[in-house]
UniProtKB/Swiss-Prot annotation:
One of its GO terms (molecular function) is RNA endonuclease activity. This is Schlafen family member 13. Its cofactor is Mg(2+). Endoribonuclease that cleaves tRNAs and rRNAs. Cleaves tRNAs 11 nucleotides from the 3'-terminus at the acceptor stem. Does not act on tRNA(Sec). Able to restrict HIV-1 virus replication; ability to inhibit HIV-1 replication is dependent on endoribonuclease activity.
Length: 897
């Protein structure tokens, strides 16, 4: 138990990760008096805790001084040196600070990160490790790799594996194998390895070298000795160019001494060697995944004509990938315990890097948070080029006023002040000690952080002020025994997310304080401040620059969401909501149980729908199966269903079944709904209003410009669609595609179909198109079917050569019947150029090109879209269909007319 984890307490009074390592002897003189075993055990507990906190967002190590003296004392040189070795950095205070309160001693640990302030050439890997457990040969020595060397080594091995994969089966690789064989056989040690006998005292004709190591047998515990040296030496040879480990040769004189036959059994020794090598952890970047290749030779050592003993020679081949001596020594906090990282986890985190975008992607997105200078658990954050940077969003949403303190958002501040007498005075009283900063109000900071709302909370207020740590205030209607737990848990989550999601690299804690607005008097404060721990002064925000840096991390926490790019890139990437999207998202669900959201093509309606369902779950404490998402087509239904945030159904299924357990409904792409199967809007209203005392949420997202039929949609008249919000910031499409969409929208305005309300068309005048995103639109006319499929295949091949994959491409036709007509011809043309699969849009996560109809692809997107002969039964809605088609393409659009 001790070797794997220490107890971790997140106590009700601690809104931080606090690891209690028990009793530790402190002070240099006191530690010198300890037995070595006890000193090592205490040091190991502290170092494991420090490493785990560094890799988990920072926190506090708490210990009780084993020496009964309460006078101030230092840690001890061995502890300090071990902490310096852990961070591989000379200045302990960059990551650690200490405080003592009586017999309680605290080490405050800042999160690990590739901090930009390391200007002296120091290197911070993605995670902190006590040991990489990686070795290589360096001259005649075995070199233990530090973090920088381990990172470079892993990257080199990864590149070699990729190169070998690309050139697999080609003659050059066979030549390289032959070259290795010749080098191996030309090694002078090879002759000894081939012999069966050797004379005691013979001096070998070759010295130690990068490929040769001499070791003597120890006189006692021979098998244990061999088992102990194998991990370092065998892994070092395997990680370099291979080599020979001689056991039984004096390394100075090169004399063969062997081991007396009475002290060793050859077969047992071979078994020990095999067992030790089989335990070596290996990590592969290649597809073949072989084990470590080695051979063991036991050579008989004769003294004259008498058998004296044995010489052991282990021949190791260079390994294709990476061999460790043991699992790397690195820890993280998981499920309230310190857990060691597995070898595979360690390699994955060490090599964690910003994703490699295809060239066009890189031009279309701007980095908001890079892994190169962020804490270990962060994911990269990108925004579409032309959208607000996190600094702009911070200035818009949470500006730091010069020289005074402000409450924001102002509308919520006024509303709460009018609703709750004495609230303004209570908050003002708490703010008096602070001269500059911002108080960010929320009806529930817990909900904002994806936690459940607590009944009885009037509001939460986050104070970000100069010369203070951040403080989270929870204001209760009346005293509540669970109020402090709620506030502490919320503050804890906020601190963790500021670091591990928002990428804040400074020293930070969030104190928690509960206030009670009692009915008898104007205000009554519960003075139980968060933590008896007094954080060091460096945890306070020194000025405007520090406050703004923290608030920019807060922007990522509040506006960040899992990007749809994650599925395409194969790693988790975050995007940011626009300010307009966030303002709608932050509306009170209790006051906006029904809302119509009108959004232009590419304005993020489906993303908003997903975010709102997550918020519903936390505000109303409901399970995912009580939230229903309804759309028109099966592919979008499947896409949402795979997110596991709700129950998702099509309109037809919604009208056919009863849904007795559903409480909240979110409807997407409502402009394409129909009424031939029944009145879906009336049914949705009936379901969400079943509970008169607590009606459910009904939010409806739509865009009349993307209406794909001339029938009645079942939506209420435009004049009855209130309350209503609009999404007018178009964020999806490249410039040329956006221009094409605008042209088609203008045609609709000039001659609108009969089922599009004229009042809706004015939304176009409010549109804001994000400029500067590269891409192209190409309209191709009068191609034959053969020419079309050949053009698509050739163009796809060019895109794949540039780094795109089949999952970036969609080919859209007018009807499902046409899908069948095009499939065989398109597949035949594709397979002349490359091996590729086609599938419909119901499986959006597979590695294939999507071939489906424009209507069924509604609500989905791809970087590259080919539209083949888009047409409709009624020409009046052709511009709508073309908008539906074009708006699915993020960067490259090809339309065959």
């Amino acid at each position: 138990m001790e070797a794997n984890h220490c107890s971790l307490g997140v106590y009700p009074s601690y809104p931080d990760l606090v690891i209690d390592v028990g009793e530790v002897t402190l002070g240099e003189e006191n530690r010198k008096k300890l037995q070595k075993t006890q000193r090592d055990q205490e040091r190991a507990r502290v170092i494991r805790a420090a490493c785990a906190l560094l890799n988990s967002g920072g926190g506090v190590i708490q210990m009780e001084m084993a020496n009964r003296d309460e006078r101030p004392t230092e840690m001890g040189l061995d502890l300090e040196e071990s902490l310096r070795k852990l961070i591989q950095y000379p200045y302990l205070q960059a990551f650690f600070e200490t405080k003592q309160h009586g017999r309680c001693f605290y080490i405050f640990v800042k999160s690990w990160s590739g901090d930009p302030f390391l200007k002296d050439g120091s290197f911070n890997s993605r995670i902190c490790s006590l040991s990489s457990s990686l070795y290589c040969r360096s001259g005649t020595s075995v070199l233990h790799m530090n973090s920088r060397q381990a990172f470079d080594f892993l990257k080199t091995k990864e590149r070699q594996s990729k190169y070998n994969l690309i050139n697999e089966g080609s003659p050059p690789s066979k030549i390289m194998k032959a070259v290795y064989q010749n080098i191996s056989e030309s090694n002078p040690a090879y002759e000894v390895f081939q012999t069966d006998t050797i004379e005691y005292g013979e001096i070998l004709s070759f010295p130690e070298s990068p490929s040769i190591e001499f070791k003597q047998f120890s006189t006692k515990h021979i098998q244990q000795y061999v088992e102990n040296i194998i991990p370092e030496y065998i892994s070092a040879f395997a990680n370099t160019e291979g080599g020979y480990l001689f056991i039984g040769v004096d390394d100075k004189s090169r004399k063969v001494l062997g081991c007396a036959k009475e002290q060793v059994d050859p077969d047992s020794l071979k078994n020990v060697i095999a067992r030790a090598i089989s335990k070596l952890p290996i990590v592969h970047f290649c597809s073949s995944k072989p084990r470590v290749e080695y051979s063991t030779k036991i050579v008989e050592v004769f003294c004259g004509k008498e058998l004296y003993g044995y010489l052991c020679v282990i021949k190791v081949k260079a390994f294709c990938c990476v061999v460790f001596s043991e699992a790397p020594k690195s820890w993280m906090v998981r499920e309230k315990y310190i857990r060691p990282l597995t070898t595979e986890e360690w390699v994955e985190k060490m090599m964690d890097a910003d994703p490699e975008f295809p060239p066009d992607f890189a031009e279309a997105f701007e980095s908001q948070l890079s892994l190169s200078d962020s804490p270990s658990l962060c994911r990269p954050v990108y925004s579409k080029k032309g959208l607000e940077h996190k600094a702009d969003l911070q200035q818009h949403l949470f500006p730091v006023p010069p020289g005074h303190l402000e409450c924001t958002p102002e509308s919520l501040w006024k509303e709460l002040s009018l609703q709750h007498e004495g609230l303004k005075e209570l908050i003002h009283k708490q703010m008096r000690p602070f001269s500059q900063g911002i108080v960010i109000l929320s009806r529930s900071w817990a909900v904002d952080l994806n936690l459940q709302e607590k009944p009885g909370v009037i509001c939460d207020a986050l104070l970000i002020a100069q010369n203070s740590t951040p403080i989270l205030y929870t204001i209760l209607r009346e005293q509540d025994a669970e109020g402090q737990d709620y506030c502490t848990r919320t503050a804890f989550t906020l601190k963790q997310k500021l670091v591990n999601m928002g990428g804040y690299t400074g020293k930070v804690c969030v104190r928690a304080k509960v206030l009670c607005l009692s009915p008898e008097s104007s205000a009554e404060a519960l003075e139980a401040a968060v933590s008896p721990m007094d954080y060091p002064a460096s945890y306070s925000l020194a000025g405007t620059q520090h406050m703004e840096a923290l608030l920019q991390s807060l922007v990522i926490v509040l506006l960040g969401f899992r990007s749809l790019l994650s599925d395409q890139l194969g790693c988790e990437v975050l995007n940011l909501l626009t300010a307009q999207q966030y303002e709608i998202f932050s509306r009170s669900l209790r006051k906006n149980r029904e809302l119509f959201v009108h959004g232009l093509p590419g304005s993020g309606k489906t993303i908003m729908a997903m975010k709102i369902m997550e918020k519903i779950r936390n505000v109303f404490h409901c399970e995912a199966h009580r939230i229903l998402y309804v759309c028109e087509n099966q592919p979008l239904r499947n896409f949402i269903s795979d997110r596991n945030i709700c129950r998702a159904e099509t309109r037809e299924t919604f009208l056919r079944e009863k849904f007795e357990h559903i409480q909240h409904i979110v409807i997407d792409e409502a402009q394409n709904f129909r009424t031939e199967d029944g009145d879906w809007y009336r049914k949705a209203k009936t379901i969400t209003q079943r509970e008169k005392d607590c009606p459910g949420v009904l939010w409806i997202f739509l865009d009349y410009f993307q209406t794909s039929h001339l029938g009645h949609s079942g939506l209420p008249p435009l004049s009855a669609q209130y309350p209503r919000e609009e999404l007018t910031r178009v964020v999806r499409n490249a410039d040329e595609i956006a221009e094409y969409i605008q042209q088609e929208m203008q045609l609709i305005i000039e001659n609108p179909p009969i089922n599009i309300p004229h009042g809706y068309l004015a939304i176009l005048s409010e549109a804001k198109w994000v400029p500067g995103v590269p891409g192209n639109t190409k309209i191709i006319k009068n191609f034959t079917l053969e020419q079309i499929v050949t053009y698509v295949a050739d163009t796809c091949r060019c895109f794949f050569e540039r780094g795109y994959s089949p999952k970036d491409v969609a080919v859209l036709v007018s009807t499902v019947t046409e899908v069948e007509q095009y499939q065989s011809k398109l597949l035949k043309a594709m397979r002349k150029k490359m091996v590729v699969q086609l599938s419909d849009a119901c499986d959006m996560l597979g590695v294939h090109i999507v071939l489906d109809s424009v209507r069924r692809f509604s609500g989905l997107e791809r970087s590259i879209v080919f539209g083949i002969h888009p047409r409709t039964a009624d020409p009046a809605i052709l511009p709508n269909i073309l908008i539906c088609l074009a708006s699915r393409a993020k960067q490259h659009l090809y339309i065959f007319l």
